[in-house]
Regions:
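Histidine kinase transmitter module recognition
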Residues: 1-4, 31-34, 38, 171
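Extreme N-terminal signal-anchor transmembrane helix of membrane signaling/transducer proteins, especially
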Residues: 1-14, 18, 22
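N-terminal sensory and localization modules of signal-transduction and trafficking proteins
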Residues: 15, 19-23, 127-130, 184
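Extracytoplasmic/periplasmic sensory segments of membrane signal-transduction proteins
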Residues: 22-119
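Extracytoplasmic/periplasmic sensor domains and loops in membrane signaling proteins
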Residues: 68-81, 104-135, 175-176, 191-221
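Extracytoplasmic/periplasmic ligand-binding sensor regions of membrane-associated signaling proteins
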Residues: 70, 86-160, 167-168
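Solvent-exposed, extracytoplasmic
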Residues: 74-88, 149-196
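A short beta-strand signature within small-molecule sensing/ligand-binding domains used
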Residues: 135-146, 216-230
Length: 230
């Protein structure tokens, strides 16, 4: 009887663990999909701005000091940029940086030399580049604007609230858990650890990497789940 009970208990425990892993995987996959959706949404918005004819015409206007140029800036450019914060409240700053001569206009239109020491000053392609800064609490999108001198004359900079982009990583689970988001260079872009009952299991990213190398799924104390943010 004791042997039968042990076998039954072991099998039941295995079934429960497998069910818990499946539930966690579903929750985790949904959280990552939500981040991917956020990134895709903002990338689509940047596509619209990067190829917008109004911005190009204002930036490339021959007489930037004319009243007509200023009027168009106020009546067309400003409302368009203002609308970004209305439709995307997570946006902290949206700026078009131009390498040619430009009359600065608030935070919306600035000379590129102001950013010349930053890594995103000169994207060499038309791809969208993402940067995350845990200390500043920002996620930044940077891309060249192809219609401004073949992409060499200006670029679009959009800074967003870090917590809004990665908000779905606050997993809706009762168990203690931790989340790391890292890039190809193994740099941590986001970290969230909720070890409320078992603080001893909280780990540094280097500890996670050691466990990750040993086993992809189950360890004695952890369940490891992974999914790529596209």
């Amino acid at each position: 009887m004791c042997l039968m009970f042990t076998m039954f208990y072991t099998q039941m425990r295995r079934v429960l663990v497998e069910r818990e892993i499946k539930n966690l995987q579903t929750t985790f996959d949904q959280a990552v999909d939500d981040v991917n959706t956020e990134l895709a949404l903002h990338q689509s918005m940047s596509d619209y701005l990067a190829f917008d004819q109004t911005i190009v015409q204002i930036v490339k206007a021959e007489d930037k000091n004319s009243f007509e140029a200023y009027e168009r800036m106020v009546k067309e450019f400003d409302p368009m940029m203002d609308s970004l914060s209305y439709f995307y409240p997570e946006i902290r700053q949206s700026t078009v940086y131009v390498r040619d001569f430009v009359i600065p206009h608030g935070t919306y239109l600035r000379p590129a030399r102001e950013m010349e020491n930053d890594e995103w000053t000169a994207p060499a392609d038309n791809d969208v580049h993402w940067y995350a800064d845990m200390d500043q609490g920002t996620v930044t999108l940077v891309r060249s604007m192809p219609l401004i001198d073949d992409g060499k004359g200006g670029f679009l900079y959009i800074s967003m609230d870090y917590s809004k982009i990665f908000g779905s990583m606050e997993l809706a689970v009762n168990e203690d858990y931790g989340v790391f988001v890292y890039n190809e260079d193994k740099e941590v872009l986001y970290e969230n650890q909720k070890m409320t009952r078992n603080a001893k299991y909280q780990m540094e990213f280097s500890d996670f990497q050691k466990i990750q190398k040993k086993e992809k799924q189950n360890t004695a104390n952890y369940i490891l789940l992974e999914k790529e943010i596209e």
